[in-house]
């Protein structure tokens, strides 16, 4: 956050208005004018770094504020360089997690201080929700380049050198624009109105935001990653931040058509996750997350496999799929299929023991079909027959009287009362 005048900290005290008319929002750049500080702000990004450009007024004191949202932080300033880390997170990480930063300002830093809330102080100790203020010796145009890493400060510096060091804001912006033009240009549409084109390409843009690249290049340029699944640094790729319960039937099917190489790399990353944590993630955020039902990464793998996207460890991926289909996960539901033992025994997930029972039954049946598809492809015919058979368990939710899929109790009875117009009643819907 750029700031001019007296130092103000705390979200409400330091906030500035900006006008839509003064704002440019593109996939590759954000620009606006901060009226309170009479400062033009622009930011562009690379895969692991960002470059901010501030155009300050010449008069008055001016500074850059950097503040993590939550968690303990530590910062150190030396010359025009800043390094540090924050442990802030919203879950899905092991103990010791940190996001490391390395940054440089292309202007002299006349002083620095730490702050928390509205209190300013000096020191280097790790503290909760601590930010850093960099006082700048001159106004005019200033560039602030920031690199991130989940491995270490040294790795953040390596990312800085590889992606933004010595490069102007304009060069980085143009590079980002070229990347986005290429990605969005992979699909050309004809006969659309301008509004339809804007809607289509805005939606296509959003399909490219997640999952996020989690791996980083080591000193030899080979991918490494900090694993949120076991807290260690490993060789290889990793992706993060995506739930599969809806994207398995939308985003990943699209990627299989317009970016099959990247899709294979994503699956290799989640196969690495299974090697490190023991299970495929149900929702990667960035590690295991108990959110939504089913193990739909199984469907992502099967869809890619049958379409020929197989540049990943297929045997290891299949082993993770097989574990999803046959073993009990944890009680929180962050991995494994909830109710899988009852599903195997009864042919459905009983509604008097598990929530979303009809949906779980159909999810498990569908992903059994996906397991069978891969099993058949790699020559595991006995497995294929087993899971093709279990895939028919979806029929056990169908009530011939009401013509709806419904939750069933362990004794075989359908849950009563039945109301097809109420979500999460005895009528369970599934798309």
Residue spans for each PLM region:
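Beta-sandwich/jelly-roll carbohydrate-recognition scaffolds of carbohydrate-active enzymes
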Residues: 1-239
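A conserved hydrophobic secondary-structure block that centers on an alpha-helix together
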Residues: 37-40, 44-52, 57-63, 126, ...
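Alpha-helical support elements that line or immediately flank enzyme active sites
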Residues: 53, 62-64, 202-217, 240-263, ...
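Inter-helical turn/loop segments and adjacent helix faces that build the functional surface
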Residues: 184-191, 257, 308-312, 372-386
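Long, well-ordered core segments of solenoidal/helical folds
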Residues: 211, 259-279, 316-333, 341-349, ...
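Glycine- and aromatic-rich loop/turn segments at beta-sheet edges
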Residues: 216-235, 275-285, 329-355, 399-419
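Extended ligand-binding clefts on enzyme/binding-domain cores
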Residues: 290-295, 300-307, 359-362, 413-431
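Catalytic cores of carbohydrate-active enzymes
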Residues: 372, 378-431
